[in-house]
């Protein structure tokens, strides 16, 4: 439980503090590698499920996973990933906010890089609600050449591709 996770984290921090300032994870003893994987997976699960988790928290964890060469977290359920769901729902409430949309795309990329599960169908459904509603206005603006609309539409199409959702005007769906 939580007590074991905390103890594992303390043990890992203690061991790493005794190592060289720039330790090479390839030379860690196997038990440290397993402990580190466990601690990072616990921190990831906690971060993804906390209501107050931020993109900075996710970026730090993604960096730690990358530094240690760890991917493919096992045992997590997609429903525990409330961070990406919260970001997506926030963007859906403010669909014209390109910064929020790009934050969703960044979070999705980081989560995929780490190998954490996420509720793909739910995210796709939320995306489709924007595609079939508010996005139509932005598409019209993009076709007219409005600079902000063109930028928004490009980000929107990229997010659609990342989610595996067809977007009119995207690849395979030529604009009329």
What are these regions (language model features)?
Residues 1-176:
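Extended alpha-helical scaffold segments
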């Amino acid at each position: 439980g939580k007590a074991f996770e905390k103890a594992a984290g303390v043990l890992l921090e203690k061991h790493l503090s005794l190592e060289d300032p720039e330790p090479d994870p390839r030379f860690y003893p196997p038990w440290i590698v397993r402990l580190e994987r466990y601690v990072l997976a616990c921190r990831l699960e906690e971060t993804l499920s906390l209501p107050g988790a931020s993109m900075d928290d996710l970026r730090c964890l993604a960096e730690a996973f990358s530094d240690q060469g760890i991917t493919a977290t096992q045992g997590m359920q997609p429903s525990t990933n409330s961070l990406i769901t919260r970001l997506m729902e926030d963007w859906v409430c403010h669909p014209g906010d390109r910064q929020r949309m790009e934050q969703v795309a960044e979070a999705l990329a980081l989560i995929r890089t780490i190998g954490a599960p996420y509720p793909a169908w739910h995210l796709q459904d939320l995306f489709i609600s924007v595609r079939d509603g508010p996005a139509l206005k932005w598409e019209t603006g993009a076709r007219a050449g409005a600079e902000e609309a063109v930028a928004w539409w490009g980000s929107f199409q990229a997010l659609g591709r990342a989610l595996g959702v067809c977007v009119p005007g995207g690849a395979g769906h030529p604009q009329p």
